[in-house]
Amino acid sequence: ERHITVIPEIEFPAHSDAVFIGYPELCCTGKPYTTGEFCVGNEQVYTFMEDVLTEVMELFPSKYIHIGGDEARKVAWATCPKCQALIERERLDGIQGLQPYMIARIQDFLASKGRVMVGWDEILHNELHSETLVMSYRGQKGAIEAANRGNYAVMTPGEVLYFDWYQADPSTQPRAMYGYSPIKKMYAFEPVPADPESAARNESIIRAEFVDPAAVEPIRADRADRIVGVQGCTWAEYIEDEEQQEYMIFPRLLAVAELAWTPQEKREWCDFKVRMNSHIPLLQQRGLN
């Protein structure tokens, strides 16, 4: 009816602190509040995740299931007997090989159920199925690498497309995560950098410094269709209520929408700004802050 697909995300193997309050045996220490990562060497973890994902798939018809895969600190794995035993048994590349092992198992499980795995760009350490979708939040490189490898990718670089970053002088704004992403910066980003100049401009926006086109690898022209979209993210650590959330998202969402739908050669900032200003009263009429 609304042409929206809700994609659930179940974070794995990190950002899982809440799980260990009820299931402390699933982390390496056996105690809550001590680590945010599942124990890779504990077979119960995979039973738990398969049970959770099975229920999620019953609730959500989405073809895509997001498993996270980001920001695993790996500290507890280094001293965990079960993790070390798994490294030896499977001849993994130390603790760095543990996350790819976990992700591969979950990827295969989802595929066996006819679903497609989505993950943040750390999953590029894996051999990925051809349909697996990579969300590139640490700059644009993850999406470029994924596309050039033949995988699908979504551009969502935190330095540009995070709505929880400041959109103006921080001294004039409600408290935000950090950074600086005004609407003009968002609008200047090119989601499909299929030539050195576009890739270098993006990198200059991300780094806030000049970048030589010769120093940046673009997406191969025959892989440009592997970038399937852009995503603006709103993390809520510093967002206190719905009004503040709307303030952080709008009108920047208008710029992100145009990035998603309009080719680079048809985008022009001054023209967009005129059209954006005409939309602001419409947003206000709908009660948006």
Summary of predicted features, one role per range:
Residues 1-117:
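Substrate-binding cleft of carbohydrate-active enzyme catalytic domains
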